[in-house]
Structures are given as C-alpha cells and as structure tokens.
Curated annotation (Swiss-Prot):
Induction: Expressed in the early phase of the viral replicative cycle. It comes from Vaccinia virus (strain Copenhagen) (VACV). Belongs to the orthopoxvirus OPG029 family. InterPro entries: Poxvirus_Bcl-2-like (IPR022819), Poxvirus_sf (IPR043018). Keywords: Early protein. Gene3D superfamilies: dsDNA poxvirus (1.10.437.20). Disulfide bonds: none annotated. Interacts with host TANK, TBKBP1 and AZI2; these interactions prevent interferon production. Interacts with host STAT2. This is IFN signaling evasion protein OPG029. Prevents establishment of cellular antiviral state by blocking virus-induced phosphorylation and activation of interferon regulatory factors 3/IRF3 and 7/IRF7, transcription factors critical for the induction of interferons alpha and beta. This blockage is produced through the inhibition of host TBK1, by binding host TBK1 adapter proteins TBKBP1 and AZI2, thereby producing a strong inhibition of the phosphorylation and activation of IRF3 and IRF7. Also acts as an inhibitor of the cellular response to type I IFN by interacting with host STAT2. The keyword Iron does not apply. It comes from the Viruses.
Amino acid sequence: MNAYNKADSFSLESDSIKDVIHDYICWLSMTDEMRPSIGNVFKAMETFKIDAVRYYDGNIYDLAKDINAMSFDSFIRSLQNISSKKDKLTVYGTMGLLSIVVDINKGCDISNIKFAAGIIILMEYIFDDTDMSHLKVALYRRIQRRDDVDR
C-alpha cells in the first residue's frame, strides 16, 4: 500500500487511478490508530465522500450500511443497489459512497481485509473505463485546487 498514501502529487500521464483507489481503500480499511498520515492525493480522495452526501437525497450512511461484499449473494445485491442509484449519485458520489462503506467497516482483523477486497472487486464491476477517466481527472483537479489554496 504505501505508494500513494503520502503522495502530494498525481500525474495524469503516468499515475494509475486504479492503483490510487486500491491503496486508498486499503488505507480506509485500517483502524484510525493504525492509519499512517496522508498526503494530498488521499486528502483529495476524501473529498469524494462529500460528493456522496451532496448527491444522494436520503441518508448516505443508511445506504452505506446496506452495502456488503462478504458473500456472493450480498455482493450481487450490493452491486444491483448501487447500480440502480448510480445516476443519482454520479461517479464521484459512488466513489464517495464506497469509501464511506469501507470507513464504516474498518478494522484490523481478516474480515475487514476481505471486506475491503470485496469493495475493490465491486468497484471493478461498477466503474467502466469512462468512469475511471472521470475519477482520474477529478482527482488531479482536486489536488491542483488544494495546491492553489495552500500557496
């Protein structure tokens, strides 16, 4: 995991959004005490949670509690649930929703690691290449905006 958690910059040409997301989900799955400090890349990833709250009409945390990737049946139900709301959430809100799901279920035992892995696999089904491109550009812009504010 340590490739992006402390990173302050992100390149559209050479960095992989999938790698960032995988590292970020692994970082989120840790307890707060175990999480290493983060740089601007993960700080920008955290802003997708705001999108989830903004784009979803109801209580995003209630929806997040219904997402489960621990069994095949619950994985399929979760996939259907998210896919049916994807137009309302947008790709940014969906990224934020899945981040909230992992954050709610964080911990240091093996079931939390399996849960995070299940969410990463769920993302592979939910996000297509266009979605990944949108996330990549959005992440880049959010980091740039943060840099502009910090100057």
